[in-house]
Amino acid sequence: MAEKTYPMTLEEKEKLEKELEELKLVRRPEVVERIKIARSYGDLSENSEYEAAKDEQAFVEGQISSLETKIRYAEIVNSDAVAQDEVAIGKTVTIQEIGEDEEEVYIIVGSAGADAFVGKVSNESPIGQALIGKKTGDTATIETPVGSYDVKILKVEKTA
């Protein structure tokens, strides 16, 4: 079975590579040192510092494994390969819900780069799925767990 690919911009991949480097070169050694110190306290069966450090080690190793997989199977998307006014990964899109005045701006990213707090939505999210492939002036229906709503695409531009 083929591995899942992770569509992303080159910038997203570089960010993941930096995060992986930080985990391997800084966080992993810090956790190993904490485990070593906790071991020196003696009896491991009732050593909460040791248990906490081992839990953190498992978390860090899980993050490393996840990032390595995403980087290994990264599919770099070139937003220049699609029409200038077409929504794709790496594009910034301004939308307006039909019947509302407020405009919303989103950056479409691969799942690895999603961060809703700063307006970066994944191509796999309901918003991303509804907008990908649409063009300026089109309308799209965004399906959410609590219902659907229609939006008009006001502007599509390459993300700076």
Swiss-Prot record:
GO molecular function terms noted in the UniProt entry: DNA binding; RNA polymerase binding
Pfam families: GreA_GreB, GreA_GreB_N
Keyword Ion transport: no
Domain of life: Bacteria
Alphabetical list of InterPro entries matching this protein: GreA/GreB_C_sf, TF_GreA/GreB_CS, Tscrpt_elong_fac_GreA, Tscrpt_elong_fac_GreA/B, Tscrpt_elong_fac_GreA/B_C, Tscrpt_elong_fac_GreA/B_fam, Tscrpt_elong_fac_GreA/B_N, Tscrpt_elong_fac_GreA/B_N_sf
GO-annotated biological processes: DNA-templated transcription elongation; regulation of DNA-templated transcription elongation
Any coiled-coil regions, as ranges: 1-72
Role this protein plays: Necessary for efficient RNA polymerase transcription elongation past template-encoded arresting sites. The arresting sites in DNA have the property of trapping a certain fraction of elongating RNA polymerases that pass through, resulting in locked ternary complexes. Cleavage of the nascent transcript by cleavage factors such as GreA or GreB allows the resumption of elongation from the new 3'terminus. GreA releases sequences of 2 to 3 nucleotides.
UniProt similarity note: Belongs to the GreA/GreB family.
Protein name: Transcription elongation factor GreA
Organism name: Streptococcus pneumoniae serotype 4 (strain ATCC BAA-334 / TIGR4)
